[in-house]
Amino acid sequence: MGGSGSRLSKELLAEYQDLTFLTKQEILLAHRRFCELLPQEHRSVEESLQARVSLEQILSLPELKANPFKERICKVFSTSPSRDSLSFEDFLDLLSVFSDTATPDIKSHYAFRIFDFDDDGTLNREDLSQLVNCLTGESEDTRLSASEMKQLIDNILEESDIDRDGTINLSEFQHVISRSPDFASSFKIVL
């Protein structure tokens, strides 16, 4: 990665800065980290911009390894039809949304998509159950009982489901998130 052919052009860097919430230095670091996941012979700028990295490789990054939503995060940001790999631009989009400078609206929009496990545009009881299981862990010691889960989801819906349709839509989710001062600062990944 030391040769002149291994750096992103000034034009491309400027374009990525315009399209993301990342600084020039953050984009260069992201490119370096992405290239480290590629085989040595495919690390030129041209090849790295065309390459796709498997979700397994992305999930091996220390910044994602401990995140309980890591698989969902990667699937939401993947543009491949099978959602099983990320391009460099997918990786940049992911880092941009999770950066300190991304707006609360952008962060809440993507958090909603990550928590919408069935991709139907709403958070229903099953999505909320999966969300809770991701947060509490799925071991016998940490898993909630069926009655505890039902009570928790009932409470979440009581608090969040403004139109009382049994689900949480994006605007209801954003309303709840707007009342959570720690959300934006906790919804981040730093390389």
From Swiss-Prot:
Any one GO MF annotation of this record: calcium-dependent protein kinase inhibitor activity
Q: Where in the cell is it found?
A: Membrane; Cell membrane, Sarcolemma; Cell membrane; Apical cell membrane
Q: Which InterPro entries has this protein been placed in? A: CIBP, EF-hand-dom_pair, EF_Hand_1_Ca_BS, EF_hand_dom
Q: Which CDD domains match?
A: EFh
Q: Which GO terms describe its biological process?
A: angiogenesis; apoptotic process; cell adhesion; cell division; cellular response to growth factor stimulus; cellular response to nerve growth factor stimulus; cellular response to tumor necrosis factor; cytoplasmic microtubule organization
Q: What else is known?
A: The binding of either calcium or magnesium significantly increases the structural stability of the protein in comparison to apo-CIB (calcium- and magnesium-free form).
Q: What is this protein called?
A: Calcium and integrin-binding protein 1
Query: Where does this protein come from, organism-wise?
Result: Bos taurus
Q: What lineage, starting at the top, does this entry show?
A: Eukaryota, Metazoa, Chordata, Craniata, Vertebrata
Gene (name only): CIB1
